[in-house]
Amino acid sequence: MNSVNNIRSTFLDYFHRNGHQVLSSSPLVPRNDPTLMFTNAGMVQFKNVFTGLEQHLYKKATTAQKCVRAGGKHNDLDNVGYTARHHTFFEMLGNFSFGDYFKEEAIFLSWDLLTKEFCLPKDKLLVTVYQSDDVAAELWRKISGLPDEKIVRIATADNFWAMGDTGPCGPCSEIFYDHGDEIWGGPPGSMEEDGDRFIEIWNLVFMQYEQLSKEERVDLPHPSIDTGMGLERIAAVLQGVHDNYDIDLFRVLIGASEKITGIKATGDFVASHRVIADHLRSSAFLIADGVLPSNEGRGYVLRRIMRRAMRHAHLLGAKEPLMWQLLPALICEMGQAYPELVRAESLISETLKLEEIRFRKTLERGLGLLNEESAKLKEGDHLNGEVAFKLYDTYGFPLDLTQDVLRRRGISVDVDAFDKAMERQKEEARAHWSGSGEAVTETIWFSVRDQVGVTEFLGYETEKAEGIITALVCDGKIVDEVSSGQKAILVLNQTPFYGESGGQIGDSGIISGEDFIFEVHDTQKKADGVFIHLGKVKSGHAKISDCVQLTVDVVRRKKIRANHSATHLLHEALRQVLGSHVTQKGSLVSPERLRFDFSHPKSVSLEELKKIEDLANEIVLQNNKVTTRLMAVDEAISEGAMALFGEKYEDEVRVVSMGAPLEQGGLKKHWSIELCGGTHVERTGDIGLIHIVSESSVSAGVRRIEALTGAAARLYLCRQDVRIREISDLLKTSSSDLEERVRSLLDERRKFEKELNDVRKKMVLNGKITESGQGDITIINGLSFMRHIVKNILPRDLKALVDAGKKQIGSGVVAFITISEDGKGSAVVGVTDDLTDKLNAVDLVRILSNVLGGQGGGGRSDMAQAGGPDGNKANEAFAALKDFLEKT
């Protein structure tokens, strides 16, 4: 009855029975709100409703909102795993009234749910109200029957909520649960309020004022209600535990990590299991909502979360990537409530696994440096910020990960020195950046907009138009006139020229007046609506207020239209072949080709690429009309239109639909529906043909395809056909047998390479092709030291050579370095069995690696390998090893 899933359902069902519209959780990446890193409260999706910018058909709503607090102002990351109630990911249950009911009904509903639906004892509950909120205090007495001592008045900002310096605001009323006097802590407002005895389980916000300025506050005409209850907190209360990590959901996740690692969640290992369970939730949900690990913004916060969990997996002794193995347990627990987890399972799994594999490569080395530096310190000391920065810059250790490692040792980090090192790096990067060469700063366009207004775009309906010059910019300054030969920027009251945005590049063409001709090389969109036309005056003089003719390069525009429409078809085809986790991560639409970046954890196979291409071309061959509609953004998304997470959209958006309508869930839905402000073909057949020419990696979890359309695609395929015929003739075979012929030649080549390599190995051991420039075997203090520098030997064959060398000398040290064609050096060192108690091959190979410019090395005491980029320093490396042996 009291499982997390049942509690969530009970809450939503209760408010649905009481006239509330049940709405889905909004994404963790807030839509249309650049001020927030992540959705961190239930009211975020209703922010514009509360401020009056939007209106909904319903007046009452209820949600179970997924939230993340791990970046910026709301950052719980450092405390997660070490306290009973801190999480990076949590669920916020809420009920909302938009000018419908107010304090009395909000208080009644909350008390009714807690005491009748959840059956909490009344004597275990107490509430707080804002000090001057007599109405709320009296309503609590009337509805709950609580005595005055259990209705606590609080004067601090904790009981007064505001959206910002201005905007809706109002007093709060918080509901607390008393865990009993066996747990330390006092009621809210007391000296002991930070204890764990009294836990806030629900916050009711009475939005009744509008803050106009610091000094002025007025009543709202339609007061509203915003409430929030942490699901994990109420679950702990209803399940009779005092710690959120003891509820059923976390017991399942922690049990899964215990089973895989073989380490019980006891003693020093409790925090690690908790960190992994919590961070798995935030990582999985962020990836499902389109965030991928990167080195900036939201992606960097995700990477910090993931790497913190991976470091704790390392503490548990996990030898293989762990988090992806826990994903099935998470989906089993939360997949029904949040189907996006199921849809994105493969993307989440692969992203977790790849990130952990990458980080493991540097984790050991970074921890080695950290242990070495911290060994010089004692409890209470500070780690040098420069060392912390090196860990960040070289080994990928976020600052909070370094702080987390040092926490148990009682050592902190000199954060000021770290910040200075970070700023120094940024300044150096800025100094090396040459800039774009543009003289005009962005601020000038806001000045232009304030003076002449925005530009009306006519390009959806026409490629020719008349207009009036409203502003001229030359050499970074606003001017009244430009003359023949000058590079300039023209702004007009209206234009058919498309300004670069949404991945589609800007139009080019001609602007002409009675006394001038201006070549437009590019068009850009600035300052939320000012279209700027960049180019050169070919003849005459252009002046402010001149009437002009604007003519877009139609041939170029036609190619751009085809490539943009093809991008939409490829996006949908990618989703159908690879899965619904595919989302757009970037694009470039030019006349020559299109480029599309998308979320996917691994390379796309040739077979998958063919399916994607065939699907897109099927829609091209349908030759159906491409439709565009203007509609409300919420309506468009409810009809299935794809929107980009984090993209800011106006209240009214342009929806582009392509492909014959299909029956889906009783509704007819076009094959592709996207929110898009770009220019498109009139019919899908106008695209002509789509051909994917390449697929590659952009970054972790992001792939890229490039494609051609129309005549460019046909020309490319014709050239490919000619090339295949020429290669077939060269290999004296037919085009149909070309693949088999190439495979045969590759097999022959591999056979000859093996034979040649075997001969080379024999010659090396016989001393016929060494290039060490010194004696191959030297006696050092009675120890035989054999070394060889060889070329054209594969690194994997060095071990066999070293083994043979050990047999040849009987007792001693053998070292080989091979130099590849690109100049890199690979080294292997062997120590005969009789000397491994005195000499370790790993220590010896690291001497070679340091000189070769590498980092460390690995292996066993009798055989180890390493490498480095400076193969030309092989002789120096051997000299360093010889010097070490002479001193040993």
Swiss-Prot record:
| Keywords linked to the UniProt accession | Aminoacyl-tRNA synthetase, ATP-binding, Cytoplasm, Ligase, Metal-binding, Nucleotide-binding, Protein biosynthesis, RNA-binding, tRNA-binding, Zinc
Q: What is its EC number?
A: 6.1.1.7
The question of whether Cell inner membrane is a record keyword is answered with no
Q: What SUPFAM superfamilies does the entry give?
A: Class II aaRS and biotin synthetases, Putative anticodon-binding domain of alanyl-tRNA synthetase (AlaRS), ThrRS/AlaRS common domain, Translation proteins
> Could you state one GO cellular component term attached to this entry?
cytosol
Pfam families annotated for this entry? Answer: DHHA1, tRNA-synt_2c, tRNA_SAD
Among InterPro entries, the record links this protein to:
aa-tRNA-synth_II/BPL/LPL, Ala-tRNA-lgiase_IIc, Ala-tRNA-ligase_IIc_anticod-bd, Ala-tRNA-synth_IIc_core, Ala-tRNA-synth_IIc_N, Ala-tRNA_ligase, Ala_tRNA_ligase_euk/bac, DHHA1_dom
- Broadest EC class? ligase
Q: Which domain of life is it from?
A: Bacteria
A molecular function (GO) held by this record is: alanine-tRNA ligase activity
Sequence similarity: Belongs to the class-II aminoacyl-tRNA synthetase family.
The role this protein plays is: Catalyzes the attachment of alanine to tRNA(Ala) in a two-step reaction: alanine is first activated by ATP to form Ala-AMP and then transferred to the acceptor end of tRNA(Ala). Also edits incorrectly charged Ser-tRNA(Ala) and Gly-tRNA(Ala) via its editing domain.
Q: What is this protein called?
A: Alanine--tRNA ligase
Upper classification of the organism: Bacteria, Pseudomonadati, Pseudomonadota, Alphaproteobacteria, Hyphomicrobiales
Gene (UniProt):
alaS
